[in-house]
């Protein structure tokens, strides 16, 4: 996947630790302590690095290893605020912390738009996608005041409609594709399932067993993959899959990924032996589990 001129890959070394300060989190399975928005994490060093980075999952902070800012951190730090940190210019801190999550959302949309422009079957909408990408890039490049004035929900909805059209053009090549948009597949037994071209936009797949499943050309925008088993699954051509979704899931050495994404460091280097799929997997429910907030960046928005 190509990316636009803005860097959409996180570069923590060029960021002022914004995700460790701007965002709140609550003590629970993802974080060991409570932290209010705008308060530096107790593990954040004076050089804006994490003091327990190599031990986050072992010390009660797995949520930190899941989060991905799509490069918003370094953009806000080095471009929007010209390289002056919130410690150097404390009067700018509150505004910087407000701007960061807005830019993060815009960068996420840029990621999706850039990916959609690589889909050959979506050529009929490439012109609209390119214009949307340019507009989103313009919004993210604004001043702090301009960024805070962006109507993100309205812009996201307009982009979402374009992405859906692109997705439908690509997935049309797959006959008898499954329709699970927004479905409750919590803990579903989908081991070895043929989900090629499936619509899984916004689906709740928490703790679902997708080991050995074929997810090529499946639309995964906003799918909640927390603790989903992706061992041996084929995600090589999955649509709109993000690093945050992979980070939240469980995979192994046999999980096949798109070239643009990295294998999470906490995944094992070995491959799971995949027995035959158990029968009787439950059908999806139509209701949805409530979405938790916080820093984890769990992308269930469509």
Report each predicted region and the residues it spans.
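Intrinsically disordered, low-complexity linkers and terminal tails enriched in Pro/Gly
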Residues: 1-4, 85-91, 274-290
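Context-gated lysine
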Residues: 35, 289, 300-301
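Tandem repeat scaffolds
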Residues: 164, 171-284, 298-302
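Hydrophobic scaffolds flanking metal-cofactor catalytic centers in soluble metalloenzymes
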Residues: 1-127, 132-148, 152-158, 162-173
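Intrinsically disordered, Lys/Arg-rich low-complexity segments
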Residues: 290-296
């Amino acid at each position: 996947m190509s990316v636009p001129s803005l860097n959409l890959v996180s570069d923590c070394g060029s960021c002022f630790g914004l995700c460790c300060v701007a965002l709140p989190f609550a003590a629970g399975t993802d974080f060991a302590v409570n932290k209010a928005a705008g308060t530096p994490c107790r593990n954040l060093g004076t050089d804006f690095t994490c003091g327990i980075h190599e031990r986050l999952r072992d010390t009660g902070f797995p949520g930190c290893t899941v989060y991905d800012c799509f490069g918003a951190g370094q953009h806000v730090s080095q471009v929007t605020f010209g390289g002056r940190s919130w410690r150097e210019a404390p009067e700018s801190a509150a505004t910087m912390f407000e701007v960061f999550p807005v830019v993060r959302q815009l960068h996420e949309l840029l990621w999706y738009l850039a990916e959609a422009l690589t889909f050959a079957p979506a050529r009929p909408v490439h012109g609209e996608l390119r214009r949307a990408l340019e507009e989103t890039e313009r919004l993210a490049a604004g001043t702090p005041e301009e960024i805070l004035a962006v109507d993100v929900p309205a812009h996201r909805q307009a982009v979402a409609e374009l992405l859906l059209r692109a997705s439908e053009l690509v997935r049309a090549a797959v006959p008898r594709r499954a329709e699970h948009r927004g479905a409750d597949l919590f803990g579903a037994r989908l081991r070895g399932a043929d989900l090629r071209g499936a619509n899984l936009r916004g689906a709740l797949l928490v703790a679902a067993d997708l080991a050995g499943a074929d997810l090529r050309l499946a639309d995964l925008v906003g799918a909640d993959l927390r603790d989903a088993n992706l061992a041996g699954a084929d995600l090589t051509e999955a649509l709109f899959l993000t690093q945050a979704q992979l980070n939240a899931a469980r995979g192994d050495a046999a999980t096949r990924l798109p070239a643009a994404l990295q294998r999470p460091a906490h995944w094992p280097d070995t491959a799971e032996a995949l027995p035959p799929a158990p029968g009787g997997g439950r059908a999806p429910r139509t209701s949805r589990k409530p979405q938790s907030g916080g820093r984890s960046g769990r992308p269930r928005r469509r």
